[in-house]
Amino acid sequence: MNEAVSPGALSTLFTDARTHNGWRETPVSDETLREIYALMKWGPTSANCSPTRIVFIRTAEGKERLRPALSSGNLQKTLTAPVTAIVAWDSEFYERLPQLFPHGDARSWFTSSPQLAEETAFRNSSMQAAYLIVACRALGLDTGPMSGFDRQYVDDAFFAGSTLKSNLLINIGYGDSSKLFARLPRLSFEEACGLL
């Protein structure tokens, strides 16, 4: 049986964690990026489909390539972040299902319905992006997820000729707490949830 994590872990992962807009000049190693993926990949996806593909942009050249796609409000925070992850989804994720879900012919569920395949890929890559954020926090990193960018530009600049499509961007690094905004409220249980 699972045991609840410590209050300190809950604070790190959720209640005290913040979305960061400014960054300390501390690099994030490639080994740390591998550790992030090694954790996030275990989060559940539908039929273990694992549609997410990630490009970790760590270089000035990569950031300049990304720059034209960024909204003005996301420009500076992205250019100064040690890493920006392009979280994408593979529109042909089902080609890996014989490896990832060998219990039956799951591939045919999606090859027979392009709409189901697209919905599944997008929904599950969004879940995997959340796992990435939690994995970063668990390893002592901060994040700044963003949907304010030109997806078509990113797809053309980074994924042309492939089956990948961008979902969102996540800045990763060690946040500068002096640049945080005041904490915004969240909906209460009564406002967001129902009991039947």
Curated annotation (Swiss-Prot):
The keyword rRNA-binding does not apply. Its cofactor is FMN. InterPro entries: Nitroreductase, Nitroreductase-like, Nitroreductase_HadB/RutE, RutE-like. It comes from Escherichia coli O6:H1 (strain CFT073 / ATCC 700928 / UPEC). SUPFAM superfamilies: FMN-dependent nitroreductase-like. It catalyses: 3-hydroxypropanoate + NADP(+) = 3-oxopropanoate + NADPH + H(+). This is Probable malonic semialdehyde reductase RutE. One of its GO terms (molecular function) is 3-hydroxypropionate dehydrogenase (NADP+) activity. Induction: Up-regulated by the nitrogen regulatory protein C (NtrC also called GlnG) and repressed by RutR. CDD domains: RutE-like. GO terms for biological process: nitrogen utilization; uracil catabolic process. May reduce toxic product malonic semialdehyde to 3-hydroxypropionic acid, which is excreted. Its EC number is 1.1.1.298. Belongs to the nitroreductase family. HadB/RutE subfamily. Keywords: Flavoprotein, FMN, NAD, NADP, Oxidoreductase.
